[in-house]
Amino acid sequence: MYTITDEAPMLATHSFLPIVKAFSKPANITIETRDISLAGRILANFPEYLKEEQKIGDALTELGQLATAPDANIVKLPNISASVPQLKEAIAELQAQGYAIPNLPEEATTEEEKTIKAKYAKVLGSAVNPVLREGNSDRRAPKAVKNYAKAHPHSMGAWSADSKSHVAHMNEGDFYGTEKSVTVSEAGSFTIEFEGKNGETKILKAASPLKAGEIIDSAVISLSKLKAFIASEIADAKAKNVLFSVHLKATMMKVSDPLLFGAIVEVFFADVFEKYATLFQELGVDTKNGLGDVYAKIAGHPMQAEVEQALTTAMENGPALAMVNSEKGITNLHVPSDVIIDASMPAMIRNSGQMWDAAGKSQDTKAIIPDRSYAGIYQATIDFCKKNGALDPKTMGSVPNVGLMAQKAEEYGSHDKTFQITENGTVKVKDANGTVLMEQAVETGDIFRMCQTKDAPIQDWVKLAVNRARLSNTPAIFWLDENRAHDRQLIEKVTTYLKNHDTTGLDIHIMNPVDATLFSLERIVKGLDTISVSGNVLRDYLTDLFPILEVGTSAKMLSIVPLMNGGGLFETGAGGSAPKHIEQFIEEGYLRWDSLGEFLALGVSYEHLGQVFNNQKALVLSETLDEATEKFLENDKSPARKIGQIDNRGSHFYLAFYWAQALAKQTKDAELKAIFTPIAEELTNNEAKINEELIAAQGKAQNIGGYYHPNFELTEKAMRPSITFNTILAKLN
């Protein structure tokens, strides 16, 4: 099962999937596709608005069910975690293509509007991964990738001991400080209730199931303390003359983080929001969508010039803002989904701890990460680099990750239990008998969040950690903080469940995240590997932080999800869907997306298939694909990022070329050898011609009939421009 997703990986699929299908056919393997793109998920949710021929199935729900089957084998490419502005763009594009879907209601007042808004909420943020991830995560850099990075090290900015770059976080009133956590002894249910100062109660979440042994947490971030913290950090950034930047995860944490982002925008531009409060209310300015929302709503208004000048003045008076795009004047505060912590912090650390200012110059930076829970890992890395200099990709070790994520574990499953509070009072989490399990005092504007972590995934996670430590003969560190309520519950379980496994001769420790970061970095510089065993958020952060420093990108990681019922989910790298790549392709016919993640995932997918179904041909495809990938890296056939040189389509040709050669050379399967020998010969004889045809297609604007929902035929034509290559491939079908 191969997923159709969004942006650059979607384009790449149009070129690579025909190769995969052609090579799989002689091994009696059928590749099916399911469309889980943002547009596909929107259409699947609104069948009642569509004509019969426009309706499509709900592929995500279907794949979610498949993930619980023992024979599941899913190759999952990155997809958009949609912010509200992206969702609106996708809706407008689909409407323009003749799909009569409704608009996203700004304020849902009628029942119909509430239903529409709830349906759209299902496709916002990281809506795909929690559905498919019915297992924990095993992510590591494959040997071929690590060897390539050592031989061809990526650039690393030099560090200075007197760098002023640092992380700033709250010291009170954040999620970390207010967290309460309990382990539920028997199965039951819970409700979340708000009780006002006047004693009136309101149900925030109706009865929902709890499993025996489940860990539940509640935490609050105080809006007033957040705003006071931001105001003091703005003054500090100005005094220290460093860039001001904010690092959140507004895509995945789709309820809490846009609210935090909006509060930060309001404090930074406090004078403007105070002066134009009435106007902004009339215009429906929503700071959850960032500063960009002010510019969008004021456009064409008689007061546009005045408001824009006020914003400019505020920027001139405040500390310099880190920029997303200096040329276009897009700041860190424009769009919540533009700066995503797991990608932005490693990029900053790799760039000497600096971000870009309005003039496009690299400057020392204050990185605001409001909640303390994980901010320390980045500060520890910065401190280490200030003391020891930049890490060296030629010699550094690796930090593979075993991540707890099955069944929406921890914060990444909290969206349906996260609320902004509208008045002072108390939020109570009660069991079915009305007993209060946890309560939190709250004030207007505070964000309350509850998380759940089921016991079976924790047991599976501990088992996976022990297996990886044993198989790779590497120390494994559980990143858990004894001073944090949730982690204390986890430490108890981890300590208990480790006793169920033979850990003789294994080096397994529990450390808080800061100590674990320093321990891992001290080993990295000696060229030693250390497995990080972490919760769901740290899984996300660490599988970007270390790969970006080690191999230059997280897209080259092997990302395996051994599903708890025996199937396999193979994710193609940990990077996103690269919007800048598709923009460049549409403008000038050059796609710089690197499909290495797809090659690696496909290799382990074939291997899993071969082992589960005893399909020897699948095992041969897996082994030869790995050989081809290694040769592909050795010969440097990844996209060159320059028009007139190899791009994504050319890289696919070379992978197919080397794969056919490996299949022709192998001796384990005579039938495959006989089929691929003439194919390898034809590709060898036509190498120059195919390259010419592929490069000739570059340098021109491309019409693929859409961004979120492109036309299949137009995209296929744009992504498969070599008639010679297509003709040779067709012989396998």
Report residues per predicted region:
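Extended, well-ordered protein cores
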Residues: 1-262, 271-493, 497-509, 513-519, ...
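C-terminal accessory extensions/subdomains outside the catalytic/core fold
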Residues: 713-733
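Ligand-binding pocket scaffold of soluble enzyme catalytic domains
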Residues: 664-667
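C-terminal, helix-dominated tail/subdomain
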Residues: 699-720
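Extended, solvent-exposed regions of the mature portions of secreted/cell-surface glycoproteins
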Residues: 689-704, 731-733
